[in-house]
Regions:
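Residues within helix-turn-helix
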Residues: 21, 32, 69-73, 84, ...
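Terminal helix-turn-helix DNA-binding modules in bacterial transcription factors
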Residues: 41-77, 104-114
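Central "turn" residue of the DNA-binding helix-turn-helix
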Residues: 28, 79-80
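Residue-level signal for the short linker/turn that defines the boundary of a DNA-recognition helix
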Residues: 18, 45, 68-70, 81, ...
Length: 114
């Protein structure tokens, strides 16, 4: 999506109410134009998958910078409505749980130190 850089910079997805309509408004286009620009997101459920992937990527960044954050804190900071939604979206985006992600980051950090 062409506005990925702006979305990642401004992080409108941290609002739990950020949905397809909010994304379209954020992009400053009509619904029709949005569907032409990104036809794969014509279905609101697929748009939500995209938004949740942005949230999961942001969660991974927070985890790398603040490994002491709780799952509840990260879910809240990233715009997920609850911790279960965060855990599910994270696993969907990365194929591993946030805990496994942190463990692998710690392992990589240890290897770099040796």
């Amino acid at each position: 999506m062409r506005s990925d850089a702006r979305v990642n910079k401004e992080k409108p997805f941290i609002d739990p109410d950020f949905d397809q309509d909010a994304l379209i408004k954020f992009m400053g286009v009509s619904h029709e134009t949005f569907c032409k620009l990104v036809p794969r997101y014509k279905d609101p459920a697929r748009t939500l998958d995209y938004i949740n992937s942005l949230r999961a990527e942001y969660a991974a960044k927070i985890l790398m910078e603040h490994s002491d954050c709780s799952a509840d804190d990260i879910a809240s900071k990233c715009g997920f409505r609850n911790t279960a939604a965060y855990l599910s979206a994270f696993k969907f985006a990365f194929g591993i749980t946030p805990t496994d992600f942190m463990n692998s980051m710690k392992q990589m950090f240890k290897k770099k130190q040796n």
